[in-house]
């Protein structure tokens, strides 16, 4: 979670976002409906091995940060539905299953939105390096939840009803059209299910220099990915929220923040009806 503060500040300073603090609404009961209540209680109390199931040593500060992220998820969803586009400066959702967290994901805030908006069709466009196995688990629990995951590492995901997997077994650096085609197919799925809200997992870990990445995107290709996504979604007037998802390059300020700022810049550009042409046009 170390990157969240630097990205939020940079997005605001560059004029790409207006920061809104979560309302402080109580999401505890919602999380106990979403996940096994025993797991939620273990994480909130910090007692027992389940408290560290996401993959880090439990601390009160981590707990409070995770809860703020979930509050932000619902705030961003509400804002996107009302205003067209919003972001939650957050990560750590798509590997969390009903029973427990894992791989640094504590609670599945993607599925949380589907739970809290049962009357809306929620589509997760997951463009992280890793497949959204936790979200796939919740698709079996929520009929209004759909997913397309474009990944280099599948994490056990497989094609099933309302969950499509586009796996890139080798780097796409020299074969960008393969990724573009997967995006276009995903857009078709979004239209076919008449999505009321799209949650875009705009991972930075597909980048060619990411220590956990295998997809091999260049900075320019990641920019093009974000541009294509927002121009389609906002052009179709589909309410859209995005989250940062993965990204693990160091140092954060020099390597990671610029990649995430591209996502904010492309969202703002599409919202205003403009078209950025190159990452160098992104204000840092």
PLM region spans:
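Metal-dependent C-N hydrolase catalytic cores
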Residues: 1-111
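Well-ordered, non-membrane alpha-helical segments in soluble/globular domains
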Residues: 1-7, 220-226, 257
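Short helix-capping segments at alpha-helix termini
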Residues: 14-16, 233-237
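Conserved beta-strand segments of alpha/beta enzyme cores
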Residues: 18-19, 144-146, 239
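Conserved alpha-helical scaffold segments that buttress catalytic/binding sites
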Residues: 74, 78, 87-235, 250, ...
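Short acidic/histidine-rich active-site segments
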Residues: 239-246
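Short, flexible active-site recognition loops that position polar ligands and cofactors
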Residues: 246-254
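Acidic/charged, solvent-exposed loop-and-adjacent secondary-structure segments enriched in E/D, K/R, S/T
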Residues: 270-284
